[in-house]
A protein has these predicted regions:
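Walker A/P-loop nucleotide-binding motif
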Residues: 37-57
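Conserved C-terminal helix/linker of AAA+ ATPases
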Residues: 232-253
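A short hydrophobic beta-strand->loop->alpha-helix junction that borders the nucleotide-binding pocket
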Residues: 45-47, 68-78
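Short amphipathic alpha-helical interface segments
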Residues: 263-291
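Mid-core helix/loop region of P-loop NTP-binding domains shared across ATPases and GTPases
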Residues: 11, 55, 75-187, 201-226, ...
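Terminal-proximal interaction/regulatory segments of ATP-powered molecular machines
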Residues: 280-342
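A short, basic N-terminal segment
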Residues: 1-39, 60-61
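Short alpha-helical segments that sit at the start of domains
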Residues: 246-269, 278
Length: 342
C-alpha cells in the first residue's frame, strides 16, 4: 500500500540538481569559494530553507585541489567528537575514542598543511550550545596560511559576535550569507517537483498540495509529511487525506528528529507534551520530567542540564520558549510545543 515510485527525492538527504529560489545565495557562496584564499562563511536562516542543500551541492563543485569535510554537529556536538570526525575525514582512517583532544589537534594540523581544506560545520548551533567556541577558536588559530576555510551553517545565529568570544570572531571574520523563509508558493513549487519525481502519476490532488504548502514553511517537515502519507495510502492524496495523517506524520517527524539524542531528550519532550494549556513554566516541566523518569526507571538530570536539553529541543524547532526577567521569581522561562507541529 504505497503511492511512492522512487523514494530518494522525498528523503531529507537528497540533493536536487537545482535548488528553488536560492540562486542569489548560491552565487554568493560560489563567488566566495572561488577566492584565492578560502573564506570563512556564516550561512544562516530558518530551518528548511535550503542551507544544507546549498552547501552539499557546492562542495561537490569545488576545485580539485580543495578537500572538503562535512561535519553534522547534531551528531558531533563537542569539540572532541568534531575533531575525531575531521581527523577521519582527512586521513580516511578510523579515529580511536581514546585520543586526547590535544593529540587530535596536532595530527590534524600536520595534515592541513599540505593542501587546501574546506570544513563545513552544519547545525553549528548544537556545537556552540554544548561546547562554546572552543572548536572555532582552535580552527581560527590554524587558519593562518589561508589553506583552511570554514562554513558555519546555523538556523538560529544571524551573527556569531554574540555567540563566540571577541578574539575568535576577530580572527574568523566570517562573511554572512542569509536565507529567508520560503513563501507558501515556493514551498508548493518544491513539493510539487519532488512529488513529480517520486509519486505515481495523478496520485496527488492540486488542492492537497496547496494545503500542504500553506501548512508549513519548513520544507523538511513538508517532505516528511508527504512521504508518510504517500507510503500509507493506495488512493490519490486529497486535502482530507493530509489532514488525517497530519498528527501521525508530525509525531514520526519528531521521533526521527530525536532518534539521535538521549532518552532524557525524549523523556523531556514527552513531559512538555503532557500539559493541556500553554505556555508552561520551566519549573512545571522539571517536575513532570522527574515523574516520567521515575516511571521509566531513569535517574533524573539536574535542572541545569535539563535547561541545556530544553535548548536542544528549541534548536530543533520542536518547542518555543520565552524568558522573562525580574518579578517575584526572578528569571522565568515559558515553554510550549512548536506551532509548526500543532
Amino acid at each position: 500500500m504505497s503511492l511512492v515510485d522512487n523514494q530518494r527525492p522525498l528523503q531529507p538527504e537528497y540533493v536536487p540538481g537545482s535548488i528553488t529560489d536560492r540562486e542569489s545565495e548560491r552565487k554568493a557562496l560560489k563567488q566566495a569559494l572561488n577566492s584565492i584564499h578560502l573564506p570563512n562563511i556564516l550561512l544562516h536562516g530558518p530551518r528548511g530553507t535550503g542551507k544544507t542543500l546549498l552547501t552539499r551541492q557546492l562542495i561537490t563543485q569545488l576545485e580539485d585541489d580543495i578537500q572538503h569535510h562535512y561535519i553534522d554537529c547534531i551528531h558531533h556536538d563537542t569539540e572532541h567528537k568534531a575533531l575525531r570526525k575531521l581527523h577521519t575525514s582527512i586521513t580516511g582512517e578510523d579515529t580511536p575514542q581514546g585520543f586526547h583532544t590535544s593529540k587530535l589537534q596536532r595530527k590534524i594540523e600536520k595534515q592541513l598543511k599540505h593542501v587546501r581544506h574546506l570544513i563545513v560545520l552544519d547545525e553549528a548551533d548544537f556545537l556552540l550550545q554544548n561546547n562554546g567556541n572552543s572548536l572555532l577558536y582552535y580552527l581560527s588559530r590554524i587558519n593562518k596560511p589561508a589553506n583552511l576555510g570554514i562554513i558555519i551553517v546555523s538556523a538560529h545565529t544571524a551573527s556569531l559576535q554574540s555567540q563566540i568570544d571577541e578574539r575568535t570572531y576577530s580572527t574568523l571574520q566570517p562573511r554572512r550569507i542569509g536565507t529567508e523563509p520560503y513563501t507558501s508558493e515556493q514551498v508548493y513549487q518544491i513539493l510539487s517537483e519532488r512529488a513529480r519525481q517520486s509519486l505515481e502519476p495523478t496520485s496527488l490532488h492540486h488542492e492537497a498540495l496547496t494545503y500542504l504548502a500553506s501548512a508549513t514553511e519548513n520544507t523538511k517537515l513538508g517532505l516528511h509529511w508527504l512521504r508518510h502519507t504517500a507510503q500509507n495510502t493506495s488512493q490519490p492524496i486529497s486535502e482530507e487525506t493530509l489532514k488525517q495523517t497530519q498528527k501521525q506524520a508530525h509525531h514520526r517527524f519528531t521521533e526521527r528528529t530525536l532518534s539521535h539524542h538521549t532518552d532524557h531528550h525524549r523523556t523531556l519532550y514527552k513531559a512538555i507534551q503532557d500539559f493541556d494549556d500553554y505556555p508552561v513554566n520551566s519549573g512545571q516541566i522539571y517536575t513532570t520530567y522527574r515523574e516520567h523518569c521515575r516511571k521509566r526507571d531513569l535517574k533524573p538530570l539536574s535542572n541545569r542540564r535539563i535547561s541545556d536539553y530544553i535548548q536542544h529541543l528549541k534548536l530543533h524547532g520542536l518547542i518555543e520558549t520565552k524568558t522573562y526577567y525580574g518579578g517575584k521569581h526572578g528569571k522565568t522561562t515559558q515553554i510550549q510545543p512548536s506551532s509548526l507541529l500543532q
